[in-house]
Amino acid sequence: MASTSDFKNGLVLQIEGQLWTIIEFQHVKPGKGPAFVRTKLKNVLSGKVVDKTFNAGVKVETATVDRRDMTYLYHDGTDYIFMDGDTYDQISISEATVGDGARFMLENMAVQVATHEDVPLFVELPVTVELVVQHTDPGLQGDRSTGGTKPATLETGAEINVPLFINTGDKLKVDSRDGNYLGRVNS
């Protein structure tokens, strides 16, 4: 059980038999009336996002989520294969569970797999990943119709927008949560 004062991003709650993770939360103290906590929750299994308000001080059931360090090995049809670094056990996780982060995963990448009662819930990649640009068109200096960015295909097949000065073969830092370009890696 956790109180609303214990809320933090990433906390997994059990509400009506389903697991929800807190994406955003805000403590609100209105001029009139009691304080409350406004949250944005994401269903761990379906990915559905809902807004929910809790009265301040209310106790909410939390779920026990184990996070294990694992290594991404390879993609096999509709599943991704991961290996536990301690036990060398391999587990198979579906595309739906891996989610959007799959487009930034490289073989042998260290990730965290969150499980609840030995069922994989989601895969957390490092916040920043370093990937090589596989293909991008040359940026024309006078071309500003696109706001100074152009599409680039990364070595994983993901496509992101990058500044015009980025070339094929450059190594980039990318935010794995939203796919934003963060900078070039000096090599």
UniProtKB/Swiss-Prot annotation:
Q: Does the keyword Methyltransferase apply?
A: no
Q: Where in the cell is it found?
A: Cytoplasm
Q: Which CDD domains does the record associate with it? A: S1_EF-P_repeat_1, S1_EF-P_repeat_2
* InterPro entries for this protein: Elong-fact-P_C (IPR015365), NA-bd_OB-fold (IPR012340), Rib_uL2_dom2 (IPR014722), Transl_elong_fac_P/YeiP (IPR020599), Transl_elong_KOW-like (IPR013185), Transl_elong_P/YeiP_cen (IPR001059), Transl_elong_P/YeiP_CS (IPR013852), Transl_elongation_fac_P (IPR011768)
| Record keyword Cytoplasm present | yes
- Location, primary (coarse class): cytoplasm
Q: Which Gene3D superfamilies match?
A: 2.30.30.30, Nucleic acid-binding proteins
Q: Give any single GO term for biological process.
A: peptide biosynthetic process
Where does it sit, as one GO cellular component term? Answer: cytoplasm
Ordered alphabetically, the record's keywords are: Cytoplasm, Elongation factor, Protein biosynthesis
Q: Which pathway is this protein engaged in?
A: Protein biosynthesis; polypeptide chain elongation
> What is a single molecular function from GO for this protein?
translation elongation factor activity
Describe the function of this protein: Involved in peptide bond synthesis. Stimulates efficient translation and peptide-bond synthesis on native or reconstituted 70S ribosomes in vitro. Probably functions indirectly by altering the affinity of the ribosome for aminoacyl-tRNA, thus increasing their reactivity as acceptors for peptidyl transferase.
In which family does this protein belong, per the annotation?
Belongs to the elongation factor P family.
Q: What is this protein called?
A: Elongation factor P
What organism is listed for this UniProt entry? Rhodococcus jostii (strain RHA1)
